Protein backbone atom coordinates (compact mmCIF):
# COMPACT_ATOMS: atom_id res chain seq x y z
CA UNK A 1 0.00 0.00 0.00
CA UNK A 2 1.31 3.44 -0.94
CA UNK A 3 1.79 5.70 2.09
CA UNK A 4 1.22 9.35 1.13
CA UNK A 5 4.00 11.91 1.57
CA UNK A 6 2.84 15.40 2.56
CA UNK A 7 5.84 17.68 2.06
CA UNK A 8 6.35 21.40 2.53
CA UNK A 9 9.08 23.13 0.51
CA UNK A 10 10.01 26.39 2.23
CA UNK A 11 12.34 27.45 -0.60
CA UNK A 12 14.36 30.56 0.39
CA UNK A 13 12.18 31.42 3.38
CA UNK A 14 12.47 31.01 7.16
CA UNK A 15 15.34 31.93 9.46
CA UNK A 16 16.27 29.67 12.37
CA UNK A 17 14.21 31.82 14.75
CA UNK A 18 11.22 31.70 12.40
CA UNK A 19 11.62 27.92 12.14
CA UNK A 20 11.36 27.59 15.91
CA UNK A 21 8.23 29.74 15.99
CA UNK A 22 6.69 27.84 13.07
CA UNK A 23 7.27 24.47 14.73
CA UNK A 24 5.91 25.78 18.03
CA UNK A 25 2.59 26.40 16.29
CA UNK A 26 2.63 23.39 13.98
CA UNK A 27 3.52 20.49 16.27
CA UNK A 28 0.46 20.72 18.56
CA UNK A 29 -1.76 20.80 15.47
CA UNK A 30 -0.52 17.41 14.24
CA UNK A 31 -0.72 15.61 17.58
CA UNK A 32 -3.69 13.59 16.33
CA UNK A 33 -2.77 13.37 12.64
CA UNK A 34 -3.27 9.77 11.43
CA UNK A 35 -0.16 7.60 11.05
CA UNK A 36 -1.12 6.67 7.49
CA UNK A 37 0.96 9.52 6.00
CA UNK A 38 4.48 10.93 6.11
CA UNK A 39 4.93 14.59 7.11
CA UNK A 40 8.03 16.21 5.60
CA UNK A 41 9.52 19.71 5.72
CA UNK A 42 12.24 20.99 3.36
CA UNK A 43 13.77 24.06 5.03
CA UNK A 44 16.70 26.13 3.74
CA UNK A 45 20.05 24.48 4.48
CA UNK A 46 20.68 27.01 7.28
CA UNK A 47 17.57 25.89 9.19
CA UNK A 48 17.97 22.12 8.86
CA UNK A 49 19.75 21.65 12.19
CA UNK A 50 17.22 23.92 13.94
CA UNK A 51 14.32 21.93 12.50
CA UNK A 52 16.00 18.68 13.56
CA UNK A 53 16.49 20.03 17.09
CA UNK A 54 12.98 21.41 17.57
CA UNK A 55 11.37 18.44 15.85
CA UNK A 56 13.32 15.76 17.73
CA UNK A 57 10.94 13.03 18.85
CA UNK A 58 8.13 14.29 16.61
CA UNK A 59 6.87 12.67 13.43
CA UNK A 60 8.21 15.47 11.23
CA UNK A 61 10.79 14.21 8.73
CA UNK A 62 13.32 16.47 7.04
CA UNK A 63 14.12 16.95 3.37
CA UNK A 64 16.83 19.00 1.77
CA UNK A 65 15.99 21.23 -1.19
CA UNK A 66 18.82 19.76 -3.26
CA UNK A 67 21.81 17.40 -3.02
CA UNK A 68 25.02 17.03 -5.03
CA UNK A 69 26.24 13.85 -6.69
CA UNK A 70 29.75 14.07 -5.24
CA UNK A 71 30.64 13.33 -1.64
CA UNK A 72 33.04 16.27 -1.36
CA UNK A 73 35.09 18.62 -3.51
CA UNK A 74 35.29 22.08 -5.05
CA UNK A 75 31.57 22.55 -5.66
CA UNK A 76 30.77 26.00 -4.30
CA UNK A 77 27.20 26.34 -3.07
CA UNK A 78 26.47 22.60 -3.17
CA UNK A 79 25.91 20.10 -0.36
CA UNK A 80 26.71 16.39 -0.13
CA UNK A 81 24.50 13.51 1.03
CA UNK A 82 26.75 12.83 4.03
CA UNK A 83 26.47 16.44 5.18
CA UNK A 84 22.69 16.13 5.07
CA UNK A 85 22.59 12.78 6.84
CA UNK A 86 24.61 14.24 9.70
CA UNK A 87 21.60 16.43 10.49
CA UNK A 88 18.98 13.70 10.22
CA UNK A 89 17.80 14.49 6.70
CA UNK A 90 15.69 11.70 5.17
CA UNK A 91 14.60 13.10 1.77
CA UNK A 92 16.16 15.27 -0.95
CA UNK A 93 14.23 17.31 -3.52
CA UNK A 94 15.85 17.23 -6.96
CA UNK A 95 14.76 18.58 -10.33
CA UNK A 96 12.48 21.32 -9.05
CA UNK A 97 11.41 23.67 -11.83
CA UNK A 98 13.25 26.61 -10.25
CA UNK A 99 16.79 25.16 -10.49
CA UNK A 100 15.81 23.74 -13.88
CA UNK A 101 14.89 27.28 -14.96
CA UNK A 102 17.42 29.48 -13.15
CA UNK A 103 20.44 27.16 -13.26
CA UNK A 104 19.66 25.23 -16.46
CA UNK A 105 19.76 21.86 -14.72
CA UNK A 106 19.48 18.99 -17.18
CA UNK A 107 17.68 15.69 -16.74
CA UNK A 108 21.11 14.02 -16.66
CA UNK A 109 22.27 16.21 -13.76
CA UNK A 110 19.02 15.59 -11.93
CA UNK A 111 19.51 11.86 -12.39
CA UNK A 112 23.03 12.11 -10.94
CA UNK A 113 21.64 13.93 -7.90
CA UNK A 114 18.86 11.38 -7.40
CA UNK A 115 21.23 8.43 -7.76
CA UNK A 116 23.59 9.99 -5.23
CA UNK A 117 20.70 10.43 -2.81
CA UNK A 118 19.65 6.79 -3.09
CA UNK A 119 23.24 5.57 -2.81
CA UNK A 120 23.42 7.30 0.58
CA UNK A 121 20.02 6.11 1.84
CA UNK A 122 18.20 9.35 1.15
CA UNK A 123 14.85 9.26 -0.64
CA UNK A 124 14.89 11.57 -3.67
CA UNK A 125 11.77 13.57 -4.48
CA UNK A 126 12.20 13.97 -8.23
CA UNK A 127 10.14 16.82 -9.69
CA UNK A 128 8.75 16.74 -13.22
CA UNK A 129 6.31 18.97 -15.05
CA UNK A 130 5.53 20.99 -18.16
CA UNK A 131 5.49 24.73 -18.79
CA UNK A 132 2.40 26.64 -19.89
CA UNK A 133 3.90 27.00 -23.37
CA UNK A 134 4.59 23.27 -23.64
CA UNK A 135 1.08 22.48 -22.45
CA UNK A 136 -0.52 24.88 -24.95
CA UNK A 137 1.45 23.23 -27.77
CA UNK A 138 0.19 19.80 -26.74
CA UNK A 139 3.67 18.67 -25.66
CA UNK A 140 3.00 18.07 -21.95
CA UNK A 141 3.02 14.28 -22.02
CA UNK A 142 6.11 14.09 -24.23
CA UNK A 143 8.04 16.51 -21.99
CA UNK A 144 7.04 14.76 -18.77
CA UNK A 145 7.83 11.32 -20.18
CA UNK A 146 11.31 12.49 -21.21
CA UNK A 147 11.90 13.91 -17.73
CA UNK A 148 10.73 10.66 -16.16
CA UNK A 149 12.73 8.34 -18.40
CA UNK A 150 15.98 10.33 -18.19
CA UNK A 151 15.63 11.59 -14.64
CA UNK A 152 14.72 8.22 -13.09
CA UNK A 153 17.15 6.04 -15.03
CA UNK A 154 18.78 3.48 -12.75
CA UNK A 155 16.74 4.43 -9.68
CA UNK A 156 14.96 2.04 -7.35
CA UNK A 157 11.24 2.98 -7.52
CA UNK A 158 10.71 1.50 -4.05
CA UNK A 159 12.94 4.23 -2.55
CA UNK A 160 11.70 7.14 -4.58
CA UNK A 161 9.04 9.84 -4.71
CA UNK A 162 8.03 11.56 -7.95
CA UNK A 163 6.39 14.99 -7.73
CA UNK A 164 4.30 16.08 -10.69
CA UNK A 165 4.45 19.88 -10.64
CA UNK A 166 3.03 21.62 -13.71
CA UNK A 167 5.24 24.71 -13.90
CA UNK A 168 2.33 26.95 -14.87
CA UNK A 169 0.62 26.14 -11.55
CA UNK A 170 3.59 26.80 -9.22
CA UNK A 171 3.09 29.97 -7.20
CA UNK A 172 0.52 31.31 -9.65
CA UNK A 173 -2.69 30.49 -7.82
CA UNK A 174 -3.68 28.29 -10.78
CA UNK A 175 -4.27 24.68 -9.87
CA UNK A 176 -4.34 21.80 -12.30
CA UNK A 177 -7.78 20.21 -12.23
CA UNK A 178 -7.72 17.24 -9.86
CA UNK A 179 -8.85 14.79 -12.52
CA UNK A 180 -6.14 15.97 -14.93
CA UNK A 181 -3.45 15.84 -12.23
CA UNK A 182 -4.61 12.32 -11.40
CA UNK A 183 -4.45 11.30 -15.07
CA UNK A 184 -0.87 12.54 -15.43
CA UNK A 185 0.17 10.83 -12.19
CA UNK A 186 -1.34 7.61 -13.52
CA UNK A 187 0.62 7.97 -16.75
CA UNK A 188 3.85 8.48 -14.79
CA UNK A 189 3.15 5.31 -12.81
CA UNK A 190 2.57 3.35 -16.01
CA UNK A 191 5.74 4.71 -17.64
CA UNK A 192 7.84 3.73 -14.63
CA UNK A 193 6.08 0.37 -14.44
CA UNK A 194 5.87 0.33 -10.65
CA UNK A 195 2.41 0.17 -9.04
CA UNK A 196 3.91 1.04 -5.64
CA UNK A 197 5.65 4.24 -6.78
CA UNK A 198 4.74 7.25 -4.61
CA UNK A 199 3.61 10.18 -6.78
CA UNK A 200 2.84 13.62 -5.40
CA UNK A 201 1.07 16.56 -6.95
CA UNK A 202 2.46 20.08 -6.51
CA UNK A 203 1.26 23.45 -7.77
CA UNK A 204 -0.80 25.94 -5.73
CA UNK A 205 -1.83 23.27 -3.22
CA UNK A 206 -3.77 24.83 -0.36
CA UNK A 207 -6.22 23.91 2.41
CA UNK A 208 -9.16 24.58 0.09
CA UNK A 209 -8.19 21.90 -2.45
CA UNK A 210 -6.24 19.30 -0.45
CA UNK A 211 -9.18 17.01 0.32
CA UNK A 212 -10.19 16.74 -3.33
CA UNK A 213 -6.61 16.16 -4.47
CA UNK A 214 -6.01 13.44 -1.89
CA UNK A 215 -9.22 11.73 -2.94
CA UNK A 216 -7.69 10.95 -6.35
CA UNK A 217 -6.63 7.35 -6.94
CA UNK A 218 -3.15 8.06 -8.32
CA UNK A 219 -2.12 11.03 -6.14
CA UNK A 220 -0.08 9.87 -3.14
CA UNK A 221 0.66 13.16 -1.46
CA UNK A 222 1.53 16.74 -2.22
CA UNK A 223 4.60 18.96 -2.49
CA UNK A 224 3.48 22.30 -1.07
CA UNK A 225 5.25 25.62 -1.62
CA UNK A 226 3.84 28.91 -0.38
CA UNK A 227 1.04 27.36 1.68
CA UNK A 228 3.60 25.49 3.79
CA UNK A 229 4.91 28.78 5.24
CA UNK A 230 1.74 29.14 7.31
CA UNK A 231 1.86 26.51 10.08
CA UNK A 232 -1.90 26.49 10.59
CA UNK A 233 -2.60 26.18 6.86
CA UNK A 234 -0.01 23.44 6.43
CA UNK A 235 -1.43 21.60 9.44
CA UNK A 236 -4.81 21.62 7.69
CA UNK A 237 -3.11 20.13 4.64
CA UNK A 238 -1.38 17.52 6.81
CA UNK A 239 -4.74 16.66 8.38
CA UNK A 240 -6.52 16.19 5.06
CA UNK A 241 -9.61 14.06 4.79
CA UNK A 242 -10.12 12.50 1.39
CA UNK A 243 -12.84 14.27 -0.56
UniProtKB/Swiss-Prot annotation:
* GO-annotated biological processes: gluconeogenesis; glyceraldehyde-3-phosphate biosynthetic process; glycerol catabolic process; glycolytic process
Any one annotated GO CC term: cytosol
SUPFAM superfamilies the UniProt entry points to: Triosephosphate isomerase (TIM)
Which InterPro entries does the record associate with it? Answer: Aldolase_TIM, TIM_sf, TrioseP_Isoase_bac/euk, Triosephosphate_isomerase, Triosephosphate_isomerase_AS
For this UniProt record, give its keywords in alphabetical order, as a comma-separated list.
Cytoplasm, Gluconeogenesis, Glycolysis, Isomerase
Q: Name the principal localization, coarsely classed.
A: cytoplasm
Binding-site residues, substrate: 9-11, 171, 204, 225-226
Decide whether keyword Ligase is in the record: no
**Source organism, top-level taxon:** Bacteria
In which pathway is this protein known to take part?
Carbohydrate biosynthesis; gluconeogenesis; Carbohydrate degradation; glycolysis; D-glyceraldehyde 3-phosphate from glycerone phosphate: step 1/1
The record's top EC class is: isomerase
Which NCBIfam families does the record associate with it? tim
Q: Assembly and interactions?
A: Homodimer.
Protein name listed in UniProt = Triosephosphate isomerase
Which species does the entry assign this protein to? Synechococcus sp. (strain WH7803)
Instruction: Report which gene this protein is encoded by.
Output: tpiA
Amino acid sequence: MRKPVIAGNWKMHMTCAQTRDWMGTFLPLISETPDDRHLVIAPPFTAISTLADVGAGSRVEISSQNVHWEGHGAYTGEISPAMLQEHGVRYAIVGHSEPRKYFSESDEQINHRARSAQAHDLIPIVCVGESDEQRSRGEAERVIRRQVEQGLEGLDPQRLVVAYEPIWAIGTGKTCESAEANRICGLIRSWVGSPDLIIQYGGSVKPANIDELMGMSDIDGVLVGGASLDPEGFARIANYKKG
